[in-house]
């Protein structure tokens, strides 16, 4: 299970949080859950396309009644802001045109790009697109992540490696990467490299330690207990061995 599932979704509410924060129960067109979800996808697609070289690690979206707040976590904030903020204004105008709402754009710098799995995956993909040998690019990313203080790193590259006819996958791993441990803080990143031989997929897992017992207890306290099935009365009918209760009151016995 832990080897296949996305580490973010697997640990949602334990070590990770939602990247879109809003609520909708309206049935009006333009305010439905599906409308907001489709709008989020369009916003992320637009930003990833226009900021392909800006080293975007994460995009967070938060909504109020008449405003959308977009937080862009990037390793190169100068590219996103542009000269005298011209690029940021252009991005804000494009987002307002797309959503039809007021956009609050926040640009946040990632202090340590080598400790961010998404940025490491993007860096390896850029090297592969520049015809760097895939093993060399993987080792370079592995060494940088270890220097940044990660307790364990796993990097996997899949596709027509080296221009081979048959696609395959290769990975390097250093340290521990416990994907089954829910309390393990696993950072995950994925990026595609576009080469002359086709696309290569790059995946990066980083293990940054476990959350403490106090933090785990606080998370578990916030989770509502599941509803027990035993508190409901059993229904009779087919498959039920319990005798049906008689609705006729029992007659009182009289001793002779």
Curated annotation (Swiss-Prot):
One biological process GO term for this chain? translation
Q: Which InterPro entries match?
A: KH_dom, KH_dom-like_a/b, KH_dom_type_2, KH_sf_prok-type, Ribosomal_S3_C_sf, Ribosomal_uS3_bac-typ, Ribosomal_uS3_C, Ribosomal_uS3_CS
- What spans are recorded as compositionally biased (Basic and acidic residues)? 225-234
One Pfam family hit: KH_2
- Return the SUPFAM superfamilies for the record: Prokaryotic type KH domain (KH-domain type II) (SSF54814), Ribosomal protein S3 C-terminal domain (SSF54821)
Quote a single Gene Ontology cellular component term: cytosolic small ribosomal subunit
KH type-2 domain location: 43-111
| Keyword annotations of the record | Ribonucleoprotein, Ribosomal protein, RNA-binding, rRNA-binding
In terms of SMART domains, this protein maps to:
KH
Provide the residue span(s) of the region labelled Disordered. Answer: 221-256
What terms describe the molecular function in GO for this protein? Answer: mRNA binding; rRNA binding; structural constituent of ribosome
Function, as annotated, reads: Binds the lower part of the 30S subunit head. Binds mRNA in the 70S ribosome, positioning it for translation.
Name the family: Belongs to the universal ribosomal protein uS3 family.
Summarize the subunit comment: Part of the 30S ribosomal subunit. Forms a tight complex with proteins S10 and S14.
- The name this protein carries in UniProt is Small ribosomal subunit protein uS3
Species the sequence originates in = Leifsonia xyli subsp. xyli (strain CTCB07)
The lineage is:
Bacteria, Bacillati, Actinomycetota, Actinomycetes, Micrococcales
Q: Which gene encodes it?
A: rpsC
């Amino acid at each position: 299970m832990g080897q296949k599932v996305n580490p973010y979704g697997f640990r949602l509410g334990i070590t990770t949080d939602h990247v879109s924060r809003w609520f909708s129960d309206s049935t009006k067109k333009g305010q439905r859950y599906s409308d907001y979800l489709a709008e989020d996808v369009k916003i992320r697609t637009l930003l990833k396309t226009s900021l392909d070289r800006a080293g975007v690690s994460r995009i967070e979206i938060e909504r109020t009644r008449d405003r959308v707040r977009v937080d862009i976590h990037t390793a190169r904030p100068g590219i996103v802001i542009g000269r005298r903020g011209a690029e940021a204004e252009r991005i804000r105008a494009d987002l307002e045109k797309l959503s039809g709402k007021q956009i609050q754009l926040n640009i946040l710098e990632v202090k340590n790009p080598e400790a961010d799995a998404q940025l490491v995956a993007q860096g390896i993909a850029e090297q592969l697109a520049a015809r760097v040998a895939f093993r060399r690019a993987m080792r370079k990313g592995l060494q940088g992540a270890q220097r940044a203080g990660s307790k364990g790193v796993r990097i996997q590259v899949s596709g027509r490696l080296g221009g081979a006819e048959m696609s395959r996958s290769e990975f390097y791993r250093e340290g521990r990467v416990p994907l089954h441990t829910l309390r393990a803080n696993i950072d995950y990143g994925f990026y595609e490299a576009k080469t002359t031989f086709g696309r290569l997929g790059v995946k990066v897992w980083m293990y940054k330690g476990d959350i403490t017992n106090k933090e785990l207890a606080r998370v578990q306290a916030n989770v509502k207990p599941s509803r027990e099935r035993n508190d409901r009365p059993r229904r009779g009918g087919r498959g039920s061995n319990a005798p049906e209760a008689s609705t006729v009151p029992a007659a009182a016995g009289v001793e002779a």
